[in-house]
């Protein structure tokens, strides 16, 4: 049973609409869908939204992406949650924009936020929802690409992706991860 949905991103207005912050975008949408408390609490280096109608919290670590493990470890300790009871939502360069993948566990795949979590909590055994953002087409640096906003054309598809990710998470909360995989694992283009 999932007890915490953790959306990864970077704190601050500067990063709000960037590709690297799709985890935050999904977390906000899920918090709204679950009618969670509108005011977040500062706890465990994160903004925490409590959802009294559901036995779940929504967390947005405020440690910057590469230090996400510190926040996740504190969430696990403060809320007495096991790694298998979290769902980490984050951007994935290796999936095209429009692709969503739900996984029970796995490696970091080169994602620094996931790498930080794995190194800090000492396990790869935690569920995750990967949101495809694609790779830069030109010779753009990956770091510049993930920290740039979506284009106008991409935003149209992004809205569909965020809505699908939200539905996926609602299914996970209702039916569990394994039963939700077929519904969740889609390419929307």
Curated annotation (Swiss-Prot):
Active site: 20 (proton acceptor)
Location within or outside the cell: Cytoplasm
Recorded coiled-coil stretches: none
Swiss-Prot/TrEMBL site (Stabilizes the basic form of H active site to accept a proton) positions: 91
One Pfam family in the UniProt entry: Pept_tRNA_hydro
First-level EC class: hydrolase
Keywords recorded for this protein, A-Z: Cytoplasm, Hydrolase, RNA-binding, tRNA-binding
Subunit text: Monomer.
Protein name, as recorded: Peptidyl-tRNA hydrolase
UniProt organism field: Sulfurihydrogenibium sp. (strain YO3AOP1)
């Amino acid at each position: 049973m999932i007890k915490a949905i953790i959306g990864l991103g970077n704190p601050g207005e500067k990063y709000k609409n960037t590709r690297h912050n799709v985890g935050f975008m999904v977390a906000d949408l899920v918090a709204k869908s679950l009618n969670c408390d509108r005011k977040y609490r500062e706890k465990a280096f994160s903004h925490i939204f409590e959802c009294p109608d559901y036995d779940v919290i929504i967390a947005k670590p405020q440690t910057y992406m590469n230090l996400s493990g510190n926040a996740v470890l504190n969430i696990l300790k403060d809320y007495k949650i096991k790694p298998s009871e979290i769902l980490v939502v984050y951007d994935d360069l290796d999936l095209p924009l429009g692709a969503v993948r739900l996984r029970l566990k796995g490696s970091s795949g080169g994602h620094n936020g996931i790498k930080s979590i794995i190194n800090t909590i000492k396990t790869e055994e935690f569920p995750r929802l990967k949101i495809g953002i694609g790779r830069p087409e030109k010779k753009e640096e990956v770091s510049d690409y993930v920290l740039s906003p979506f284009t106008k054309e991409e935003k149209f598809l992004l809205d569909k992706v965020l809505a699908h990710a939200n539905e996926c998470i609602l299914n996970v909360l209702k039916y569990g991860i394994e039963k939700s995989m077929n519904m969740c694992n889609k390419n929307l283009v």
